[in-house]
A protein has these predicted regions:
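Compositionally biased terminal segments of proteins
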Residues: 1-230
């Protein structure tokens, strides 16, 4: 496949950094977004735990850990389908976590592309164990939230940091939805954490908040404001 001109202008070889991917997707959204999600407001506010996932709380008791990735988003937006469970632990706990999982019947499958490993539950569920060394990790592991099933998940500011660093298409979709649904108090917490740990991402964060609020019809598009004023 030929590299599209808009991509080639930024990265002639087509190899975009996460920040470049994020900026392109934000620009696309700015041009194409329209208010409304296609779902009723009641659905947008619904928080469920309909998809069953392995309960690792008894297995990892005493070890700090949190659910991240797609499953974690159900604490902040409507639940969406995903094929695996991602958890985040401290790098130094990796060996003990693997030993405990294997003792509980989990099977080690392979290493991940990032530091960590893939395990499979006795029921065949894939669990990605991410070994974290983020500068904010210790802080985040003391400020966990609970999802609708009572499982520990990263608080919104740290989940935002992880998804901004990854910046895949589905991550940007999750970000605009979660930020669009967040309260002003939650957004203040996100801004504060991003300002401390990733100040270079502050401009993109504001764009994602704006896009999310337009999607949730919390703010009108600039063109709509102009029409109303005219």
């Amino acid at each position: 496949m030929d590299i599209p001109p808009a991509i080639a202008a930024i990265a002639p070889d087509g190899r975009l950094t996460p920040a470049q991917r994020r900026r392109i997707l934000i620009d696309l959204c700015r041009r194409r977004i329209r208010p409304g999600t296609g779902s009723g407001s009641g659905f947008s506010q619904r928080r469920t735990a309909l998809n069953p996932w392995p309960d690792l709380r008894p297995v990892l008791r005493g070890i700090p850990w949190a659910i991240v990735g797609a499953v974690a988003t159900r604490a902040y937006m409507p639940e969406r389908a995903t094929k695996d469970l991602d958890i985040l632990i401290r790098r130094e706990d990796g060996d003990e976590v693997r030993e405990r999982l294997e003792a509980a019947g989990y099977r080690y499958v392979s290493r991940l592309a990032v530091p960590g490993f893939l395990a499979q539950s006795p029921e065949g569920v894939e669990v990605d164990v991410v070994l974290g060394d983020y500068p904010w990790l210790e802080e985040a592991l003391t400020r966990l939230r609970q999802d609708p099933a009572g499982y520990p998940v990263l608080a919104l500011p740290y989940l935002v940091l992880m998804k901004m660093e990854s910046s895949r298409g589905r991550d940007l979709g999750d970000l605009t939805t979660m930020l669009g649904l967040a309260s002003e108090e939650e957004l203040a917490q996100v801004r504060e954490v991003v300002a401390r740990y990733a100040p270079e991402e502050a401009e993109d964060l504001e764009s994602l908040i704006y896009l999310g609020q337009v999607e949730m019809e919390k703010v009108p598009l600039a063109e709509d404001r102009t029409d109303a004023e005219g």
